[in-house]
Amino acid sequence: MNEEQRKASSVDVLAERDKKAEKDYSKYFEHVYQPPNLKEAKKRGKQEVRYNRDFQIDEKYRGMGNERTFLIKTYGCQMNAHDTEVIAGILEALGYQATTDINTADVILINTCAIRENAENKVFSEIGNLKHLKKERPDILIGVCGCMSQEESVVNKILKSYQNVDMIFGTHNIHHLPEILEEAYLSKAMVVEVWSKEGDVIENLPKVREGNIKAWVNIMYGCDKFCTYCIVPFTRGKERSRRPEDIIDEVRELAREGYKEITLLGQNVNSYGKDLQDIEYDLGDLLQAISKIAIPRVRFTTSHPWDFTDHMIDVISEGGNIVPHIHLPVQSGNNAVLKIMGRKYTRESYLDLVKRIKDRIPNVALTTDIIVGYPNESEEQFEETLTLYDEVGFEHAYTYLYSQRDGTPAAKMKDNVPLNVKKERLQRLNKKVGHYSQIAMSKYEGQTVTVLCEGSSKKDDQVLAGYTDKNKLVNFKAPKEMIGKLVEVRIDEAKQYSLNGSFIKEVEPEMVIQ
């Protein structure tokens, strides 16, 4: 749905504070908001998606934030971190200044994550903690944005129980923030503007990047995979790829600004380019183009095994600035569980992909995601996940207990694996994760590695820390001037999840860029 189509069908949504407690607010969202619905959400590709490269903030909004400050609290994935950079960019363009003091901030935004129940609980706790601030300083604005805002039940809960919130907006209309803020300042009612359908791809949005060493580069929006446990296709919309020329221009600018590493972002980066109707262009082509740009390291996340092509493998195998680290979520090692998850691949096809990757990229580091305790998962099925882990030999994994998300197909399944069983399985899996991580780390002892120094260690300000191209954390002592630089470090000690080493020297960029 493009901007013109939206304007023709949209309605303003304002919920009066004095009536919120008695109403069901879902009816307010008939045009601008719909709850997650698999059948409706799968109706993709018919609405025209336009590319808007002329984004500008209307002059009437500039100066709105003069002598005002803002603070954004961010939960969730790298895409949320990227969105926060855009929100901060818009706020600064309006005249606001960033602050780290929540007690003095004039605008407080909570950028939310809906992927797991635990993340949502943290957000509601955070909103509740802000009630006293709103009471003490009624002129401040408190807003909720991000993926949770795309869920009807969440918006209803905020409207009913959290009257300290002034505005709610979603993932598709961040560029409308100036209008939302103005409405919030002028209205005594809560301002709710949540688009269920994605809009145009908006380029040239201002950004305030976190740091000047590493940068996020969004290459696409949305996801069309509809894994049965996942709310993301509903909260982020259909897959929409940015134009390659826009991405390449952004990466070139980051290289000119001196960034040492970029991460190409998308809910499923391997689907990049499938929706570009005028050209045949995929992630492999994009990586090939970016490999020619003078930026030392290029990563990408997140990958779906179903879309991982041999072309991509070949491009990564050529080396250069594309790092030999692939995060390849498997979720389960059992075919029956994979089928009810809607993952579209089998244990056998996943292992075949891993073999092709290892054959072409012998030095690759593979990491993964795994969900434990999916509905109907038996002990035997879980053990197949453990044996798959052995067979692949992942160097690390992010492991999770299954978390039911309302609106997903899995929410209709009986969650029949007892919590104590889930926790016991997770403990066994994590023991295996630690075992293989230790094996991978031990191979570095006595070796010299190149590390991108990112700053001081979280545990010791006198120690610097950074990551290798395979995403291994390295701690070492060196002059503070090395922060932001690529350095050589000899590894003296391998721990389970990190490495300790001795600084050797700075690495000149031309020694890294191929």
Curated annotation (Swiss-Prot):
- Protein name, per record: tRNA-2-methylthio-N(6)-dimethylallyladenosine synthase
Which sites bind [4Fe-4S] cluster 2? Answer: 223, 227, 230
Report the top EC class in one word: transferase
Q: Per the similarity annotation, which family is this?
A: Belongs to the methylthiotransferase family. MiaB subfamily.
Give every MTTase N-terminal domain span: 68-186
What job does the chain carry out? Catalyzes the methylthiolation of N6-(dimethylallyl)adenosine (i(6)A), leading to the formation of 2-methylthio-N6-(dimethylallyl)adenosine (ms(2)i(6)A) at position 37 in tRNAs that read codons beginning with uridine.
User: Which gene is transcribed and translated to give this protein?
Assistant: miaB
Subunit structure, briefly?
Monomer.
SUPFAM superfamilies, sorted: Radical SAM enzymes (SSF102114)
Name the cofactor(s).
[4Fe-4S] cluster
The organism encoding this protein is: Staphylococcus aureus (strain NCTC 8325 / PS 47)
Return the annotated region ranges for Disordered. Answer: 1-21
- Provide the binding site for [4Fe-4S] cluster 1: 77, 113, 147
Describe the location of the Radical SAM core domain by residue ranges.
Answer: 209-440
User: Source organism lineage?
Assistant: Bacteria, Bacillati, Bacillota, Bacilli, Bacillales
What Pfam families does the record point to? Radical_SAM, TRAM, UPF0004
One term under GO cellular component: cytosol
The record's Gene Ontology biological-process terms are: tRNA methylthiolation
